[in-house]
Curated annotation (Swiss-Prot):
Function recorded in the entry: Probable cysteine protease.
Enzyme class: hydrolase
Subcellular location: Membrane
Protein name, entry field: Probable cysteine proteinase 024R
Keyword Hydrolase in annotation: yes
Active site residues according to the UniProt entry: C132, H325, N355
Broad class of the protein's primary localization: membrane
TM annotation in the entry: 467-487
Keywords, in A-Z order: Hydrolase, Membrane, Protease, Thiol protease, Transmembrane, Transmembrane helix
Length: 491
């Protein structure tokens, strides 16, 4: 149960102007007041004291690069289900579980599935580079290898390799669909042991928490200029993906509102996380929504610390547009008895997503819940939508990408970069880059899922008033009572 205490009367607004409002964890990236302690806790504040957010992708476009989902693809997925009938999900061929994800362990999971969940990637950090398209794709490829049983370790796939060898817009954005296609047709992709994110993570120009109001410079010039590893003549695993890469979006191909969500769920259960694109709005960026109302993001919510949660179309209009973003969907669930409109409650289905704004973003260790379509109609995954920004420029986003892997990674000798020309120090000792560590098996044991799916403890009650505030509020009432009592004293 989530506790909420909203005080929006005139007295509160008066006192709010006089002192900061303390909300645990919520960070507001507008002109509104926030407590400095909250900003510090958020992980979004750079060493210079400036609150920053990652630059958002303007090139997330899943159309035109890969084919839409068709009847043959449903048949293929059905055959995969049939093949896995002896697995722990066999009884869900028709009835899918209402809650499932690759982060937590559920009672239905067998020992093999529990072991695989140890190797699923946690949220990464793209820093100031607009590389969500590369970071989310790299993590999903590694997950796919784990779920397919092709590796018995965490692959730790390299986003830097994607930015270098399949550059697209590099730090200005790109399409996960096109990246997957190029990986399947090219020379694959390697792990961070070959080429990691040092170009950004160890460079002061890039390793801030993100750009203030998304006003980051284009940092593509920092990306290595040619494919290769930091250490030459070293053996590294090369991973690839199958050519079967598909777009899922309502109204595209044979995808409908009736079949899209069940198809996505079955793919996640069978093959692992999928990739999704969506519009990021002003009310999303702070991650404050992850801490209230079941943690589900509704694009019509205000999500302003210190104010009652209300819903209005203004919050998902073009004036609120911030950019487009790509993330991995790792599961789904149902939030029980949450507000989905002003003064309206109910059970709302959501997608459980892994962001790339580091694990300190939001209140769920870098993960978040996105209300499914049609609960959200602008910031959502299932439908391609067009949104015009405040300058009347149209933007199009939405859709989900599915893919599969079926070939074990192969160790190959890689070329060496000229590290003397690199404008940054490496994150780790040189020996770490000397070859892949297939024995990389994190000791972290996945936690049991809460009964209602991924959730965080409720927020402590926000502290809006000091003792002086309360005294000033109560004093007038006491004076009135005293006057009334004096008036009743017999003369």
């Amino acid at each position: 149960m989530t506790l909420e205490w909203n005080i929006d009367d005139k007295f509160h607004l008066f006192f709010r102007k006089k002192r900061s409002v303390y909300i645990v964890g919520g960070v507001h990236h507008d002109e509104d007041e926030v407590d400095p302690k909250v900003v510090a806790q958020s992980g979004l504040q750079g060493d210079d004291g400036v609150v920053r957010l990652p630059p958002l992708n303007t090139l997330v476009n899943f159309l035109g690069h890969v084919s839409p989902y068709m009847h043959a693809d449903y048949a293929f997925l059905h055959r995969e289900w049939e093949y896995n009938r002896t697995a722990s999900f066999a009884d869900d061929l028709v009835n899918l579980p209402s809650v499932y994800d690759w982060r937590y362990v559920y009672p239905r999971d067998d020992e093999e599935t529990k072991r695989k969940k140890r190797y699923i990637m946690p949220p990464d950090n793209q820093y100031l580079c607009g590389s969500c398209w590369a970071v989310s794709t790299a993590s999903a490829i590694g997950d796919a290898y784990v779920v397919a049983g092709l590796v018995d370790w965490r692959p730790d796939i390299s986003p830097a390799w994607a930015l270098t060898c399949y550059p697209q817009g590099q730090c200005e954005g790109g399409s996960p669909a096109l990246l997957l296609k190029e990986i399947s047709q090219g020379n694959g992709i390697v792990s961070n042991h070959c080429l990691d994110y040092s170009f950004c993570a160890s460079n002061p120009r890039c390793n801030g928490a993100a750009a203030n109001h998304f006003g980051a410079e284009n940092l593509s010039e920092l990306v290595p200029k040619s494919c290769g590893c930091y250490v030459g003549d070293s053996m590294h695993y090369r991973y690839t993906v199958d050519p079967l890469i598909r777009t899922l979006a309502i109204g595209v191909g044979t995808v409908t509102e009736e079949n899209i969500q069940s198809t996505i769920k079955r793919h996640i259960l069978t093959h692992g996380p999928v990739l999704a694109g969506y519009f990021v709005l002003k009310n999303f960026t702070s991650g404050y929504f992850t801490r209230i109302n079941g943690g589900v993001y509704f694009d019509r919510g205000n999500y302003i610390p210190g104010q009652a949660l209300v819903f209005n179309d203004h919050y998902c209009s073009g004036d609120s547009y911030r950019g487009s973003h790509a993330v991995a969907i790792i599961g789904w669930g149902v939030a029980r008895n949450v507000l989905y409109d002003t003064d309206k409650r109910g059970d709302v289905p959501y997608w459980y997503c892994r962001n790339s704004w580091r694990s300190t973003w939001g209140g769920d260790d870098g993960y978040f819940k996105m209300a499914m379509y049609p609960w959200n109609r602008v910031a959502q995954f299932e439908k391609l939508v067009t949104l015009r920004d405040r300058d009347n420029v149209p933007h199009r986003c939405g859709g989900i990408i599915t893919f599969t892997v079926s070939t074990k990674p192969v160790k190959v000798k890689m070329n060496q970069l000229n590290t003397t020309l690199l404008p940054f120090p490496l994150l780790r000792d040189r020996s770490w880059y000397g070859g892949d560590q297939e024995e990389y098996r994190p000791a972290i044991v996945p936690k049991l899922a809460p009964s209602d799916g991924p959730n965080k403890p409720p927020l402590p009650l926000p502290v809006y008033y000091s003792a002086l505030d309360l005294a000033l509020l109560v004093l007038p009432a006491l004076l009135i009572v005293i006057v009334v009592l004096i008036g009743k004293i017999p003369t």
